[in-house]
Design a protein with these regions (language model features):
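ATP-dependent adenylate-handling active sites, centered on carboxylate activation for C-N bond formation
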Residues: 1-124, 164-209
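Structural motif
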Residues: 7, 135-148
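A short, charged helix-loop
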Residues: 123-134
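A generic structural signal for short, non-catalytic loop/turn and secondary-structure boundary residues
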Residues: 146, 159, 216-218
Length: 227
């Protein structure tokens, strides 16, 4: 149903939810685009902190700090995913070059890819167009959000929801992807989207009278399944 290999395990869970939903309705609203439109991902503000980290801490101490940070996470079954994410983040920060490029490189850094891919495969870098689009300018949260819109949102999440929902004859619509909303948030100052550590700040402020505070401040949970 995907017409090509699709390495997003959350497609399985999405299909189950779509199948259950179809038993009650024929059209459903999704939250797709909420993080890209309103700045809901941790990597957005972490990207801004990267410059401070690499300039304050001398380069010779980067590896020491990285090893110490990852050692704080024990490798128990329930912490293994967190340890992997921490290692990935620290490698991205510590790696020479573009931090955000390293974060979106599917879990592997350039030096790792060179070790296990033949040169012919490595030459065809699917993310090369990203560097060409953004260039070497200082990136803003809006730049990060636009990258995700073209890469993960259009190429993964929307494909996943469309294929799995239509397989159950359920029609899904994504109100957050209204063009006017996207254009509006692109014109806002960054602190309207990420205020300190508060992600999707303006969205929470707009609906705080309708939802309890604990609901608005719940931690993010992925939808992937163990594969």
């Amino acid at each position: 149903n995907f017409d090509e290999p699709f390495a997003d395990s959350s497609a399985l869970a999405t299909y189950v939810v779509a199948n259950k939903t179809k038993q009650h309705v024929t059209v459903a609203l999704t939250g797709d685009g909420g993080d890209e439109v309103f700045g809901g991902y941790n990597k957005y503000y972490i990207g801004k902190l990267n410059h401070k980290y690499t300039t304050i801490i001398p380069k010779g101490f980067h590896s020491t700090v990285a090893n110490f940070a990852t050692s704080l996470l024990k490798t128990t079954d329930d912490k293994r995913g967190k340890r992997f994410k921490a290692n990935r983040l620290i490698k991205a920060i510590n790696y020479e070059g573009d931090f955000y490029y390293n974060i979106i490189s599917l879990g592997f850094q350039e030096d790792e890819v060179k070790n296990f891919l033949k040169s012919d495969y490595y030459k065809n870098n699917p993310l090369q167009f990203y560097k060409e689009i953004i260039g070497s300018k200082n990136k803003t949260i809006t730049d990060f959000r636009n990258i995700d819109r073209h890469l993960s949102l259009e190429g993964d999440m929307l494909v996943k929801v469309d294929r799995t929902s239509m397989l159950t004859s359920l029609e899904c619509r994504a109100p957050f992807l209204n063009k006017e909303i996207w254009n509006f948030t692109n014109q806002l100052p960054e602190n309207y989207l990420i205020n300190g550590w508060d992600k999707k700040h303006i969205l929470k402020e707009a609906f705080k009278e309708y939802f309890p505070k604990d609901f608005l401040n719940k931690s993010k949970k992925g939808f992937g399944v163990p594969v």
